[in-house]
């Protein structure tokens, strides 16, 4: 008897272009689950609430009632060493949101982006040390207390050197080992591999697959440095471009074959959805992800022997 296939869903984007692009997928019944940037209303504003459009709130409520809603934090700054008032307020608002709607689990980004009064929206890695692991476990406990549901982390795309990529899997495993959830982003794995000249498959195989409950699949873009000696293009996990299928889908297939606790696969894309051609490319990428999942779990369907 095969494994239960995961849900396949979308990350909700706060843009009208997303609503137009994704509507045919919802209408066709292809979206099993919804993930939302759970702190989108208040994360960047130091606690000031910026309410969502009504159509978004209604959509969140529908998926929460179906027990198919997932939360993803952006602005907490998980590994900032000194918890500040903004983060304490963030935790209070997370608790309020998780009391309002039921989430299957809530994840945050690995790394840090806040120092004192500065909020930097580029996440930075942290050296893998015992102190950093203890800090991560403490922050994970704070998330769990606020969310009152399973919580976890997403692997980071940025790296300042090879060790940030090669040690990340063990680093995450040490933090999450007690009770945490790993959100495995395969585009992030490929991004680190490309930028550092490392084999993506080898990086992927280091992750603790038994902790993976969610997978992210996305696209991104390339940045061309202008004022550095090294003029190589840098891959960014910016979600603003089509999915590089030839590179990312094989990594997805590898992960699908190994993640026994996998619950959901989410496709992410934001921006550049203004034309019908861009919207159709978005839908085609989602269908490609869904097809990859269906293919990987084809053996889960009852076969002739089961029917007999």
Task: Tell me the role of every PLM-derived stretch.
Residues 86-182:
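Active-site acidic/histidine proton-transfer and metal-coordination neighborhood
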Residues 1-22:
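Boundary/entry segment of secreted carbohydrate-active catalytic domains
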Residues 144-228:
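Acidic/histidine-rich catalytic cores of soluble enzymes
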Residues 34, 106, 185, 215, ...:
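Conserved, mostly hydrophobic/aromatic
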Residues 45-51, 84, 123-133, 192-261, ...:
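Gly/Pro-rich active-site loop or hairpin
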Residues 32-45:
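A short beta-strand-loop structural module common to alpha/beta enzyme folds
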Residues 23-30, 48-71, 88-104, 141-146, ...:
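Acidic (Asp/Glu)-rich catalytic clusters
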Residues 276-303:
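C-terminal helical cap(s) of enzyme catalytic domains, especially alpha/beta-barrels
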């Amino acid at each position: 008897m095969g494994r239960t296939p995961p849900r396949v869903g979308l990350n909700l984007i706060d843009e009208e272009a997303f609503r137009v692009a994704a509507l045919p997928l919802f209408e066709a019944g292809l979206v099993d689950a919804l993930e939302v940037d759970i702190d989108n209303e208040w994360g960047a504003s130091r606690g000031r609430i910026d309410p969502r459009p009504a159509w978004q709130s209604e959509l969140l409520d529908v998926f929460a009632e179906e027990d198919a809603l997932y939360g993803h934090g952006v602005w907490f700054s998980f590994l900032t060493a000194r918890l500040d008032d903004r983060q304490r307020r963030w935790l209070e608002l997370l608790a309020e949101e998780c009391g309002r709607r039921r989430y299957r689990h809530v994840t945050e980004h690995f790394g840090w982006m806040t120092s004192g009064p500065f909020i930097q929206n580029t996440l930075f890695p942290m050296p893998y040390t015992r102190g950093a692991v203890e800090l991560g476990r403490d922050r994970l406990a704070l998330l769990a207390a606020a969310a009152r549901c399973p919580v976890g982390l997403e692997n980071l795309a940025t790296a300042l050197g090879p060790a940030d990529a090669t040690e990340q899997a063990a680093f995450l495993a040490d933090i999450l080992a007690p009770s945490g959830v790993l959100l495995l982003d395969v585009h992030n794995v490929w991004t680190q591999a490309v930028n550092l000249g490392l084999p993506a498959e080898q990086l992927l195989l280091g992750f603790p697959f038994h902790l993976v409950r969610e997978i992210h699949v996305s696209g991104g873009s390339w940045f061309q440095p202008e004022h550095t000696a090294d003029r190589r293009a840098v891959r960014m996990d910016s979600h603003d471009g089509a999915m590089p299928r030839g590179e990312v889908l094989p990594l997805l297939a590898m992960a699908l074959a190994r993640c026994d606790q996998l619950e959901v696969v989410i496709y992410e894309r934001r921006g550049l959805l203004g034309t019908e051609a861009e919207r159709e490319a978005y839908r085609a990428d989602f269908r490609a992800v869904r097809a990859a999942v269906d293919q990987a779990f084809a053996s889960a369907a009852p076969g002739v022997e089961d029917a007999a």
